[in-house]
Structure formats: C-alpha cells, structure tokens
Amino acid sequence: MNKKEKEIIKIILRAYDHHLIDQAAKKIIDIVSKTGVNIEGPIPLPTRKEVFTVLRSPFVNKDSREQFERRTHKRLIQIINPNKKTIESLMHISLPTAIDILLKK
C-alpha cells in the first residue's frame, strides 16, 4: 500500500433517540482511539423526518386528524488506516439494541 492510499472504514449509526446515538458514538470513539488510529467524527448526517397522518375517528369526521412524527438521526464515524486490533475491538463492542450500525469499507 502506498503512503497516499488510505484505507477507511465508515461506521454509520442510526437511531430515533439523538442522546442514545451520541453516547454510542462516544463509546465507539473511546474504544477505537485506544488502538492508536486516526478517527474523524462523529459527523452528524441529515435527520430523516417521517410524518404519518391518521384519522381520529373510525367512521366519520374526516376533518379530525392526528399527525405522528418519527425522526431518524444519523452519525458518521470514519476510521483511517485501521489495524487488526481496531477491527477486533469493533467486533466485540456492545451497544444498545435501539441503534442500527452499518459498516462500510
């Protein structure tokens, strides 16, 4: 591998609760930084907002509606030139089940 080539692992975290996702990102950064690699992030990505509209009444009153909203927060963490110890520490990390993790190379 040349000095100019960088191997990057991208970790994308998704969750409905932004406090939970920030805690998970901090935990990942703490664990990975102990292995001595360069880290970029957490970088906040755009929040996806979904709005659901439902009728309040089961039969009449079409004008009476209720709206529900679901926001999906995302964070990006980039690990530059990871070593074997870094990847092994990522495999054994435990995060809450409410967080979706996507790893890309």
Swiss-Prot record:
Keyword Cytoplasm listed? The answer is no
Tell me yes or no: is Metal-binding among this UniProt entry's keywords: no
Taken from the record, one Pfam family name reads Ribosomal_S10
Instruction: Tell me the superkingdom of the source.
Output: Bacteria
Q: Please give the InterPro entries that the UniProt record associates with this protein.
A: Ribosomal_uS10, Ribosomal_uS10_CS, Ribosomal_uS10_dom, Ribosomal_uS10_dom_sf
GO annotation, biological process: translation
The Gene Ontology CC terms held by the record are: ribonucleoprotein complex; ribosome
The molecular function terms in GO held by this entry are:
structural constituent of ribosome; tRNA binding
**Gene3D superfamilies associated with the record:** Ribosomal protein S10 domain
| Sorted UniProt keywords | Ribonucleoprotein, Ribosomal protein
Q: Fill in the subunit field for this protein.
A: Part of the 30S ribosomal subunit.
Please describe what this protein does.
Involved in the binding of tRNA to the ribosomes.
**Family (UniProt):** Belongs to the universal ribosomal protein uS10 family.
Q: What HAMAP family does this protein's entry cite?
A: Ribosomal_uS10
Q: What is this protein called?
A: Small ribosomal subunit protein uS10
Q: Which organism is it from?
A: Aster yellows witches'-broom phytoplasma (strain AYWB)
Upper taxonomic lineage: Bacteria, Bacillati, Mycoplasmatota, Mollicutes, Acholeplasmatales
